[in-house]
Every structure is written in C-alpha cells, then in structure tokens.
Swiss-Prot record:
Widely expressed. This is Gibberellin receptor GID1C. The gene is GID1C. Its EC number is 3.-.-.-. Belongs to the 'GDXG' lipolytic enzyme family. One of its GO terms (molecular function) is hydrolase activity.
Amino acid sequence: MAGSEEVNLIESKTVVPLNTWVLISNFKLAYNLLRRPDGTFNRHLAEFLDRKVPANANPVNGVFSFDVIIDRQTNLLSRVYRPADAGTSPSITDLQNPVDGEIVPVIVFFHGGSFAHSSANSAIYDTLCRRLVGLCGAVVVSVNYRRAPENRYPCAYDDGWAVLKWVNSSSWLRSKKDSKVRIFLAGDSSGGNIVHNVAVRAVESRIDVLGNILLNPMFGGTERTESEKRLDGKYFVTVRDRDWYWRAFLPEGEDREHPACSPFGPRSKSLEGLSFPKSLVVVAGLDLIQDWQLKYAEGLKKAGQEVKLLYLEQATIGFYLLPNNNHFHTVMDEIAAFVNAECQ
C-alpha cells in the first residue's frame, strides 16, 4: 500500500525539479477532483481546469499551426504544426501548401491523459508538439481523439486511425524526393498506447509507418507487478488511479487482460512475421507501470520486431514536458536521431 501523502510528496520533491513537481502535483489534484467513485467524470470542470491555447497561423519560434476537421460526424479535429520560413507570415491559403523539403517527416501525435484528460489544444501539448517540429524539422499532426469514459474503447483508436488515413492521403504532405508521406506515430501515456494500436491497423492495411515513439506508454494487466507495489503512490500516481482509468476506457465488464491494456497478453494478436514499424520505447524509472512498459518492449523483441529501449532511472512521469532536467534533453536527442535515421 502507498504511504501517507506527506511522505509521498517529500520523496517526489527530492528527484523532481520544482516547476515539474508543481505542474504534475496540480494535475494530480485536479484529476482527483474530476474522477467520481461511480466511474463518471466531471467533464465540464475538466475543460475549465485544462489551460488551452488556440491555433496560431502567425509563426512563433519558427512554427505556425492550424486546426483541421477530419470527420464532421464525430467532430474529430487535429491540430497541424508546420515549420515557417524566417520572416514569413502565411495566409489562410498557404496552410496546406506542399511541404518544402526533399524529405519531411510527418509525426502523428497522440496526447496523454490516461484516455480521459487533456486534448490537442492543451497548452502543455501545444508546446511539446511545437518542440517536435523544431527538433525534427517535421510536420506534426496532433489528434484530438474522443476521451473516456464518455467514449470508451475503441473510439480513441478509431480516431487515430482516421487521422492516419487522412495524413497518408494528403498530397501536400508528400516529400519531394519520392512523393511519399514519411509517417511516424508518437504519443505519451495513453497516447503511447494508441500509437501501438493504430500501428497494428496500419500494418494490416499496408499503410507504411516508419517508426513508433512511445513515451511512458500506458499498458497494464491483471497481476500486480513489482514496480506497481514498490512505487504505488510515491511519484504522483497510485495503482487505484490506474485501475479507475482502465475501467473508464475498456468495454464494460472487461478486465485488464483485454488486448487494449495488455498488447502481449494471452488474448492479443501476435506480431510475429508482420512488418511492424521500428519502435522507440521510453521508460521512466519512477513510473509505477514501468514493468508493463518493459514487458511491452520485450514483447516486441520476442516477436522479431526492431525496438530501442530508453530507460531513464531517475525520471518520473511528465519529465519530457519541461526542459528543466537532463532526462528531457536525452529523450529529445533520441527522438531526433530516431526520426532523422529514416529521413536521410
């Protein structure tokens, strides 16, 4: 069982930079207010507490953005981020001009939030996507997928799949060198989970995805692992929290052996023999579900898939949101190298 909140806060303060600690502690407080014991969720309060930013066609630090409706029936929206030439200010007619580059990676990004929180226009994810543009010289398409518990499995996967198909069919995203859309999938927490499941659909439909980037991906199972027992409540998250989110997302009556939660469990499809994208799996050593993340990386390896595991021993959840720690710079360098290796 987790210790007292006072002890947990003291422990987390010793390893987390102050502004990151404040950021994630505020998230934890808000999340506790939003979840209800009966499995419902205070969406109105969640939207009020989540600081959002609009798309901005005026370049900021060399990046401009705009929102696109992908599916009017489901109100599926994505925010597109593009590099801007120095000193230019694109007009509305320029937003979907062909990409200007021999090879331009396109990163389809899925935000975190345990399937229930945040959105494509959340300030923290707007900032992260802008960083990815500058880091990789990429176009980033951030998916505003439907959230649980109002929209359970497989809604988030369906939305991710719809955006991937839209990206793949968008001629203005093709690199000049070979007229191909060079697609990467990336996401954190629940977004990392969505990356895996959308990639499986891509393989089955023969849409070429060059790589998957999973930051602290949200996976699980019915057993309690060593890391879940050891880190329960110590660094912002409890096992009880995670259980609530799985109950909110999975089909009613399902347990955590469902393939959406346990991708290499007894009920999941085998990836052996499939042309699955190569993967970069980033694991924080102070994330209580790290054992499930490590099991995921091992599952890819056993299935004969290419995977690079980046294990950061003293990192906590959310370390990649603020550039105030060495782990942030390490993972950003790894992401850039991972993407650039396929864009020579």
